[in-house]
Each structure stands twice: as C-alpha cells, then as structure tokens.
C-alpha cells in the first residue's frame, strides 16, 4: 500500500512539473512579430486617427478622462496612459464596477516616446499586441485590452492605426508594471492566440457590410 501511495505522489509531482514546464515555455501562444514598415502618409494617419479615436477607442482608454463632462472626454496629454486599477480603486465612468480588481493594472502610455511609450516598439510588435494580445516582451496582455475584438480589424486599417499612433506627440509618462493575482496571472497567459491570416475590410460601396464590420471592431 505504501509503495502505491509513493508512486501516486511521484506521478502527481511529475505531472505538476510537466504542466509547469509547458506553461513556462509554451505560453502565451505567439509568433514572431512581422517586420512590416508602415507608410506614414497623411492619408494613412488621418484614417488611423478616425479609427483610433472614434471606432477602436484607443485614445479614450489610454488617456485620463474628464468624467465631469458628458461622455468623459480624454484630456491632455492624449495617449499618455491612465491611473492604475487596484483592489482599492474607486472606479468611475467606463471602469465603474471594476472595484476589487485582481491585482494592479496600469493603462499604458501609447505615445511614441522612446523610453516610456511605443517609440522602441516595431510596427509589427504593435500590430501583434493589438491583434494577438502579446506585448513586446512576449507576455500576454490583460484582456481589458480587447485584442479578441481587434483581431477582426482589416490589415489596411490596422496599419493606419499604427501610423496615427506614431504621429502622436511623444509624452514621457511612466506607468508601474502590472501585478496580477493568482490565478488570473496564469489565465492571462492562456488566452492569446496567434493570428496569421490576412483580414480584409468589406467593399466600401456595400454600406451594410461596411457598417457590420465597423460595429464588429468597435470598442
């Protein structure tokens, strides 16, 4: 009987070690960022501005908001990040109801600042983060960043968004690293999925299909 117990315990230990090795070495699922270099044309930047501000809501989420005004418009400096959410946060606006957050999450600076923003990221790394939920360092993003929605953004539109982000005024704005509680910290690594097929926008002349597409990718 004792031998059976020992074998069972050893089997459990081995299974745990194998599971941990798989988790530590294989997650999050990811592919290398593409080496794409996006054209910073005026047309691309303007298209990206429309999408980032009005559809994907990048600017609203990554800027402080004035909740004393209707709709809580973003305030300067635009795109420089927001205060952290923690268990003690008194959430307001779009974050209402997110008290007791499982750890600490700080909305990042997405301006092209080299040290604290996206300035040191490649275009491909930004696209991979937005669509696939994996950051520059290969870690899974917390799904408050809706990459599971943005994976449907067409390639041309995604490139336009990056062109706009590159055109923003760089702001030096440090945000603390996240600290996510167990088991959420492990789940965050499970959710990202590689995305390697082209995404196409519908024909602009088909207003119904175009509207459906925008409604699908809208935040």
Residue ranges and their predicted role:
Residues 1-32:
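N-terminal type II signal-anchor transmembrane helix
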Residues 30-53, 188-216:
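Electrostatic cytochrome c docking/interface patches
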Residues 18, 22-30, 176-199:
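Alpha-helical membrane-targeting segments
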Residues 53-56, 105-107, 140-142, 217:
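Extracytoplasmic
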Residues 48, 55-65, 126, 161, ...:
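The canonical Cys-X-X-Cys-His
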Residues 21-23, 120-136, 149-175:
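C-terminal capping alpha-helices of c-type cytochrome domains
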Residues 61-67, 131, 146, 166-167, ...:
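Detector for the c-type heme attachment site
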Residues 65-123, 141-155, 178-192:
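Gly/Gly-Pro-rich "capping" loops immediately C-terminal to redox-active cysteine motifs
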